Curated annotation (Swiss-Prot):
Protein source organism: Synechocystis sp. (strain ATCC 27184 / PCC 6803 / Kazusa)
Family as reported in the entry's similarity comment: To A.fulgidus AF1212.
Domain of life of the organism encoding this protein: Bacteria
Protein name: Uncharacterized protein slr0039
Coiled-coil intervals, chain numbering: none
Amino acid sequence: MANSPQCLLVGSLEPYSGKSGIILGLARLLQQQGMAIAYGKPIGTAMNKAAAALEEADIEFISQSLELAPAQVRKPLVFLDEKTITRRLQGQDQTNYAEALEASIQGLTADLVLLEGPGNLWEGSLFGLSFSELAAKINAAVLLVGRYHSPLVVDGLLKARQTLGDSLKGVVINDIPLEALPETKDLVKPFLESHGIAVLGLLAEDRLLRSVSVRELAHQLNAKVLCSEEHLDLMVESLTIGAMNVNSALEYFRQGENKAVVTGGDRTDLQLAALETSTSCLILTGHAGPQPLIISRAQDLEIPILSVDQDTLTTVEIVDQAFGNVRLQEPVKVQCIQQLIATHFDLQAFQEIMAKG
């Protein structure tokens, strides 16, 4: 593209692999070296208005975290909601989104434009905005994030190399369990590099980055906050269900740290036991409210209590979903990912690769 800045397209093999975090961490490193950064997300993957609002809030959060002026940010050209998809399928929408993206990039003044790709390599194909189409249209270098599930993460990365060719400049393997780090360093990394794939970062799993704020859980559950509302920014790293006798419960509760405990509103014994361990919030189901002594103790310990209308099973399903779809919205997470990238991302190798074009 004539008169266009260099572009780095950051993608993933699956949603919620950590693209936003990688972008935040890498962008901050580059800014510290004096580079002017711009950021964009060409395609919004939200399926409804509520999800679209959250996605736009995430874009705004990244922009603010990087202190980018509005002129240095490009919001989605299209969202994958049902109405938009139907219009495209019916032929009512004939927009050439790839050309629209190219035009929007040409209006940016930056040393590097970081673009966040869709959830996988094929999403957006209906609109001409699949990952490979994006990379080709704007002549972008590609950085892929692979979330570790097993050593077979190499399968997806090898296939991506076949699809993307020389535009794939490197990969970051994210969320690696500590026990799998040696194998990933000694076997997976050399194997990928022997197949022409530069491994620029190996990031161990971090409980904080996979945690959810009490505030977010309250939002997802449509919960009523009964006390300690000023402490909704506490982070929840795990979920525990309290449905046993109190003697078993105390030992069980001690096994989890920074946890949310889901239990019945009438189980005063379990509520007290949970409050005496590392608990970030109580989530009470059913229609029975907690006793005054529970409210008082929770206030003393600065632990929020949430009351929900759902039954225990539904509540647990919603919380589990929240853990699976973690958003990067808390400053403490930004600090964490920036430290991880600063420590474990090979910036020198990245810059050398980018300089070669």
